């Protein structure tokens, strides 16, 4: 006998959970489409050489990589951005530029499983390809805000930085292994200040004083300062080198654009510690956290990558985008009690008291569906207790009962499962009116 078990870091999704996820994905998809992003799909499995060049050393350790039956070196995708690079390199001539795409799919990372972190999880990516304009960067942040608000979230913050600022800080302190240093800095929230200090000392051969001063600069944050006050505070950094100057100027321009979009200023702040560990980022980067659940980590992150297709094509295509971590958001929304708790998408359950009533019940269910009301027929003619118990368990809002009187008069009796109130022998049109109203109106 095989024990029915699931691998650590993976999970089954019960109907209630799957319904919640489908509802959230539908909402963010509508937001993406409203901004003109179009859907694409790429395979879960890619040649390893496609995925590996842009993966950090930490990510490379987490990639599921193996030889397939044809002895090909293949790997499961760890994000949706690297496959996008391969996709646009292959199809850019027919796509047209700039190209706005969204993709929703599962990705795989063999990281340590913990709350809100899985080894298989769903990403919702949206990207703007083929333009270096900061208008695109601002629009991506606008989509982040619109998406989270569509999920009934209001209390969050998009933390923004620029890779050139981090490169400029490393340059100022004479750090030669820039990518490695930024990979370590990106783990500040995960391993803490002492952990970052130890890794910088070990991996980048930096002395304690340099590390201390570097980390002091990396931890510069806007906090409660206004945008104008913060940019005045950091203006001196522009004189340090061109990287810092360019990074700060880009952030100033971005803030102008976000102001033009009338995005509330309390929803985005500058934080120099935001690095994004993936090596392909070159410009503005951002991570989004829920203010009440910061321990959950980033629920939406991304940034600009100006060398998207360098590994696949001589024609360089820039891009900027973000990814929503829908599985983490489900954890948060459940704790906030903002998700539908039902285990069915059908609003009405139709129960028959006798076998011969099923033809009428099925016609009734189809009429409800044609009217936009999801309905199902309980498949057995039983005492009324059993279908009512089923409806309570699944979460149907109404039970329509077909007994002898209802069958003969082509009516139905309707019970509101929330209020417990029941109306007997209703016409279809009257029942339709009631079902379409708020529950408390019955």
Swiss-Prot record:
NCBIfam families: hisS. Gene3D superfamilies: Anticodon-binding domain, Bira Bifunctional Protein, Domain 2. It catalyses: tRNA(His) + L-histidine + ATP = L-histidyl-tRNA(His) + AMP + diphosphate + H(+). PROSITE patterns: AA_TRNA_LIGASE_II. This is Histidine--tRNA ligase. Homodimer. Keywords: Aminoacyl-tRNA synthetase, ATP-binding, Cytoplasm, Ligase, Nucleotide-binding, Protein biosynthesis. GO terms for cellular component: cytoplasm. It is found in: Cytoplasm. It comes from the Bacteria. Its main location: cytoplasm. It comes from Helicobacter pylori (strain HPAG1). PANTHER family: HISTIDINE--TRNA LIGASE, HISTIDYL-TRNA SYNTHETASE. Belongs to the class-II aminoacyl-tRNA synthetase family. Its EC number is 6.1.1.21. GO terms for molecular function: ATP binding; histidine-tRNA ligase activity. InterPro entries: aa-tRNA-synth_II, aa-tRNA-synth_II/BPL/LPL, Anticodon-bd, Anticodon-bd_dom_sf, His-tRNA-ligase, HisRS-like_core, HisRS/HisZ, HisRS_anticodon. GO terms for biological process: histidyl-tRNA aminoacylation. Pfam families: HGTP_anticodon, tRNA-synt_His.
């Amino acid at each position: 006998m095989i024990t029915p078990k699931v691998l650590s870091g993976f999970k089954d999704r019960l109907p209630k959970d799957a319904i919640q996820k489908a509802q959230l994905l539908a909402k963010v998809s509508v937001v993406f489409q409203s901004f003109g992003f179009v859907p694409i799909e790429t395979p879960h499995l890619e040649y390893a050489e496609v995925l590996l060049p842009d993966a950090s050393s930490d990510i490379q350790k987490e990639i599921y990589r193996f030889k397939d039956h044809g002895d090909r070196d293949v790997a499961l995708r760890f994000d949706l951005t690297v496959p996008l690079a391969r996709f646009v390199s292959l199809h850019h001539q027919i796509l047209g530029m700039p190209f706005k795409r969204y993709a929703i799919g599962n990705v795989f990372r063999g990281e340590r499983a913990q709350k809100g972190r899985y080894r298989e999880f769903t990403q919702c990516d949206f990207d703007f390809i083929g333009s270096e304009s900061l208008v695109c960067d601002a629009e991506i942040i606008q989509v982040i805000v619109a998406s989270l608000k569509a999920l009934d979230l209001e209390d969050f913050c998009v933390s923004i930085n620029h890779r050139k600022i981090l490169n400029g800080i490393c340059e100022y302190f004479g750090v030669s292994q820039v990518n490695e240093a930024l990979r370590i800095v990106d783990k500040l929230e995960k391993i803490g200040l002492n952990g970052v200090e130890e890794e910088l000392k070990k991996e980048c051969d930096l002395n304690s004083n340099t590390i201390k001063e570097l980390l002091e600069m990396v931890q510069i944050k806007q906090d409660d300062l206004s945008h104008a006050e913060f940019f005045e505070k950091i203006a001196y950094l522009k004189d340090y080198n061109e990287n810092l100057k360019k990074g700060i100027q880009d952030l100033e321009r971005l803030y102008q654009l976000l102001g033009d979009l009338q995005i509330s200023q309390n929803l985005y702040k500058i934080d120099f510690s935001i690095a994004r560990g993936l090596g392909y980022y070159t410009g503005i980067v951002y991570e989004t956290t829920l203010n009440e659940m910061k321990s959950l980590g980033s629920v939406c992150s991304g940034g600009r990558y100006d060398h998207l297709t360098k590994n696949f094509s001589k024609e360089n295509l820039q891009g900027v985008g973000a990814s929503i971590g829908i599985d983490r958001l489900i954890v948060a929304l459940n704790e906030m009690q903002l998700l539908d708790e039902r285990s069915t998408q059908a609003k009405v359950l139709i129960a028959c008291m006798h076998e011969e009533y099923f033809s009428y019940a099925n016609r009734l269910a189809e009429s409800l569906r044609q009217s936009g009301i999801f309905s199902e027929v309980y498949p057995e003619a039983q005492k009324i207790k059993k279908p009512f118990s089923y409806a309570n368990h699944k979460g149907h809002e109404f039970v329509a009962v077909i007994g002898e009187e209802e069958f003969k008069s082509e009516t139905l009796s309707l019970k509101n499962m929330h209020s417990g109130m029941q109306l007997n022998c209703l016409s279809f049109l009257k029942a339709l009116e009631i079902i379409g109203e708020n529950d408390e109106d019955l």
